[in-house]
């Protein structure tokens, strides 16, 4: 989000490519109030967010809010204002979605964008995503429409009353966010339409509601379509991380060749904090803040902290990425 020179060349840095902001409906702290950055309360929250980003150890973050880029837009706008705190880290735009899939869960999917992506491209990206059932482009209005379309039985599962969503837009928006699913083909199409390679598919694998939930033997075409098209996967299993980047280990040796054959070519594997608050509680994996990687599964990338640096790591994932407390080279 800011231009800097990196005279020391590529070096190992912590990257947290999965954090949320107060714009995310699933946020553990104080959420944004309606009105955008023009609200004084929201401005204070953004300043608190900037302070937390600067204080935490990672050099790079990606804001992965559910269904929206509002957190990203608010951060960008605040940084342009007089008197804004200075952001000392690299922040990428991102979004977290749920895909319609042959699973018992709502399949988790992300997209990461360059920090130089124009706002209009992000708006166009959302308009290409199709919300299942109502067949509308993703928007707040679409989420509210979905909530008012689905049955009362489905709403009850989430503790929501039908009458509430009929008469309260905020409750309808929340309900829609809880149940919405995006058409998978529209997800792929939306990524492909982003110009200049500024969007990267990012699939959780064995983390929460990830692709591993799909029974690939029964739904091979669906599984393989996402398995091969996603340049980045999220995993906290070290043997599986090694299999993604192309490294055979004693723990993955039995299935490594078939895994790589299905994958097509090595992919970058990362582990994000999935932070839903600015500052977490030490030792509590359920209350992780920015840079609080679970169980010391820290993502390290040896590249400049830029979008081009990320692309370089995607091309050379084995030698430019590591998940763990510290890369061996830094232990020497």
Over which residues does each language-model region extend?
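Short, conserved, surface-exposed binding loops centered on an aromatic residue
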Residues: 192-195, 223-225
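Internal active-site segments that recognize and position negatively charged phosphoryl groups
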Residues: 180-192, 198
């Amino acid at each position: 989000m800011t231009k800097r020179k990196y005279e020391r060349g590529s070096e190992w840095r912590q990257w947290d490519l999965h954090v949320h902001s107060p714009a995310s409906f699933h946020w553990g702290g104080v959420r944004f109030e309606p009105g955008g950055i023009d609200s004084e309360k929201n401005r204070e929250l953004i300043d608190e967010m900037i302070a937390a980003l600067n204080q935490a150890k990672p050099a790079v973050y990606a804001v992965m809010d559910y269904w929206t880029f509002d957190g990203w837009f608010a951060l960008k706008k605040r940084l342009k204002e007089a008197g804004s705190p200075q952001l000392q880290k690299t922040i990428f735009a991102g979004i977290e979605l749920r895909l319609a899939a042959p699973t018992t869960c709502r399949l988790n999917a992300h997209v990461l964008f360059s920090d130089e992506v124009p706002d209009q491209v992000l708006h166009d990206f959302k308009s290409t995503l199709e919300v299942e059932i109502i067949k509308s482009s993703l928007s707040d209005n679409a989420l509210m429409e979905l909530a008012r379309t689905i049955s009362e039985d489905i709403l009850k599962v989430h503790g929501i009353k039908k009458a509430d969503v009929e008469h309260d837009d905020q409750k309808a928006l929340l309900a829609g966010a809880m149940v919405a699913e995006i058409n998978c083909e529209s997800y792929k199409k939306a990524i492909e339409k982003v110009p200049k390679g500024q969007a990267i598919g990012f699939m959780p694998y064995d983390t929460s509601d990830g692709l591993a939930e799909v029974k690939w033997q029964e739904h091979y075409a669906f599984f393989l379509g996402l398995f091969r098209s996603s340049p980045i996967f999220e995993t906290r299993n070290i043997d599986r991380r090694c299999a993604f980047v192309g490294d055979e280990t004693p723990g993955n040796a039995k299935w490594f060749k078939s895994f790589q054959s299905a994958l097509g070519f090595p992919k970058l594997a990362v582990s994000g904090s999935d932070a839903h608050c600015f500052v977490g509680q030490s030792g509590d994996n359920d209350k992780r803040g920015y840079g609080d990687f679970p169980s010391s599964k820290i993502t390290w990338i040896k590249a400049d902290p830029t979008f081009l640096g990320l692309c370089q790591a995607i091309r050379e994932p084995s030698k430019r990425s590591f998940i763990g407390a510290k890369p061996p080279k830094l232990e020497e």
